A protein has these predicted regions:
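Glycine-rich phosphate/nucleotide-binding loop
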Residues: 21-24, 78, 201-304
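Phosphate-binding loop/pocket of nucleotide- and phosphate-handling active sites
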Residues: 314-332
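Glycine-rich phosphate/diphosphate-binding loop of Rossmann-like nucleotide-binding domains
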Residues: 1-7, 123-195, 208
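Short acidic loop-to-helix transition motifs that present clustered carboxylates
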Residues: 20, 86, 193-200
Length: 332
């Protein structure tokens, strides 16, 4: 809202939906049955977090966030990772330029396809099954998107992460399709890593990494590690994208609801701000996007107003006020 007040050509209209834990307590569902249809008329979606200490996690996730992502076919999850000015990595001798990554996560199928079941619950032969589903269509389109992202970055380096030594069907297909798609992107340098080895590489040789593409589960885990290596989970943004622009994309910080600090006013809002940067860029508001990113970098580089997870003592409201002051020019 502060940006729209200082950008003469930026007009943003907000509609807020009360979907989530409180809505579930009243209605027995996380969002209306026609909620996905309601969202289709909007240009973009700005998401807070899904979770409630009194509601099982699988209900809050599948009833809201995943329902939106899959319902709007937001098949590409883009997660930029960067060491912001003034922020220290827990890794030794890591410079700002050493962590500048772009993770692309398959966001529509794979380990989170939702296929499976459970029987004989409560008996000794209680049985459950979750099915990992990979389709050529799904794998090919996310890999092509990842190649496009890698091509747009200065280093033009793309790493494929799988576990094809142990997962000998679906992950082998990932490897095979990657080899095929790479033929159309000969200007992009490629390499492959097993997911367990990738965690070691991220810690021991972070500057060797640029753009990474992985399955739904693997990228979900790797990007939590990536966020922590860049300073804090509270910094990291993400975009759930429909690159084909048939439906609106959705932007959110990657962290969950953080029940242990809920209501204390100490949450780190930087991930939410950075998600707004991504949203504005996707809407074509390049100038506003750049201004907001510069404001974030000014905030972190000055180190005057920082949340507790970044070594400061400022409240969420203090940080928000400081950001507004930077954007509106009150903080010169």
């Amino acid at each position: 809202k502060a940006l729209s007040q200082t950008e003469p050509n930026l007009i943003i209209e907000f509609t807020e939906f009360d979907w989530g834990g409180d809505y579930y307590r009243k209605n027995g569902i996380m969002m209306p049955e026609d909620g996905v249809e309601m969202l289709k008329s909007y240009d973009s979606i700005y998401f807070g977090s899904a979770g409630d200490p009194d509601i099982p996690d699988h209900i809050t996730l599948w009833g809201l966030r995943l329902k939106i992502c899959q319902g709007l076919d937001q098949y590409a999850n883009l997660r930029p990772v960067k060491l912001l000015p003034g922020i220290s990595s827990p890794l030794k001798n890591v410079k700002e330029k050493d962590i500048d990554w772009s993770f692309i996560r398959e966001n529509s199928e794979g380990e989170y396809s939702g296929i499976g079941g459970r029987s004989h619950k409560g008996y000794s032969h209680d049985t459950s099954m979750d099915v990992t589903l990979f389709t050529r269509h799904g794998v090919e389109r996310i890999q092509k998107y990842a190649f496009e992202i890698a091509r747009s970055r200065p280093r033009k380096l793309l790493t494929l992460v799988t576990k094809s030594n142990a997962q000998r069907h679906g992950m082998v297909m990932w490897d095979e399709i990657f080899a095929e798609v790479s033929q159309d992107y000969r200007d992009v340098t490629t390499d492959k890593m097993l997911v367990d080895a990738m965690t070691t590489r991220m810690v021991l040789d972070p500057k060797s990494i640029d753009t990474v593409v992985a399955s739904n589960l693997h990228a979900d885990i790797l990007t939590d590690l990536a966020a922590s290596l860049s300073g804090s989970m509270g910094i990291a943004p993400t975009g759930n994208l429909d690159p084909d622009k048939r439906h609106p994309s959705m932007f959110e910080p990657i962290h969950g609801s953080a029940f242990d600090i809920m209501g204390k006013g100490i949450a780190n809002p930087i991930g939410s701000y950075w998600s707004s940067v991504m949203m504005l860029e996707s809407l074509g508001e390049v100038n506003a996007s750049k201004r907001l990113m510069l404001a974030i970098e000014k905030l972190t580089s000055e180190k005057k107003v920082l949340p507790r997870d970044l070594g400061g003592e400022s409240s969420t409201q203090d940080i928000t006020t400081a950001m507004i002051d930077i954007i509106t020019g009150k903080n010169k």
